[in-house]
């Protein structure tokens, strides 16, 4: 499950009756993940865990066993400074990289959400394009992150790769 994997990575997790609290405990550790149908690790969270592991201590592997071509977004994380190699349906992640803000394109809904997380974690400014994918699954995502204290806003702009 996601919470078990987060705990394995040295991320604090407290589960209540109707809420889960996630908190920083110290250095986040790398981990190996294989997506699986329920109750295994969810394929829909694979892009987000890859993004987290790119910034974790140590090397990690994430194998996508549910869908093909689910790692297309990795090239966008690389543009931000992530050190990730893709072999088939496996991402080999060389962690502890500080991501840098840049312009990236969202190839799909889940990857778009992961790129928002990467952009919020990066130093400098990031610009995400093709956010229509994000809008299909996350209503006013920028408002939710702003409510948590993030510096995020929506603007009209055309793709200008950096």
Segments and roles (model prediction):
Residues 1-162:
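Short, structured segments at the rim of ligand-binding sites
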């Amino acid at each position: 499950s996601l919470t078990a994997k987060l705990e394995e990575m040295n991320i604090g997790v407290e589960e209540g009756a109707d809420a889960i609290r996630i908190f920083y405990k110290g250095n986040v550790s790398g981990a190996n993940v294989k997506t699986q149908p329920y109750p295994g690790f969810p394929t829909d969270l694979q892009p987000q865990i890859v993004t987290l592991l790119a910034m974790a201590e140590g090397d990690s592997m994430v194998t996508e066993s549910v869908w093909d071509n689910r790692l297309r977004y990795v090239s966008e994380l690389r543009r931000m400074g992530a050190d990730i190699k893709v072999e088939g349906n496996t991402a080999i992640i060389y962690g502890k990289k500080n991501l840098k803000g840049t312009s990236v394109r969202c190839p799909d809904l889940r990857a778009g959400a992961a790129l928002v997380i990467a952009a919020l974690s990066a130093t400098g400014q990031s610009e995400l394009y093709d956010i229509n994918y994000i809008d299909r699954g996350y209503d006013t995502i920028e408002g939710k992150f702003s409510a948590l204290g993030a510096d995020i806003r929506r603007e009209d702009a055309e793709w200008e790769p950096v």
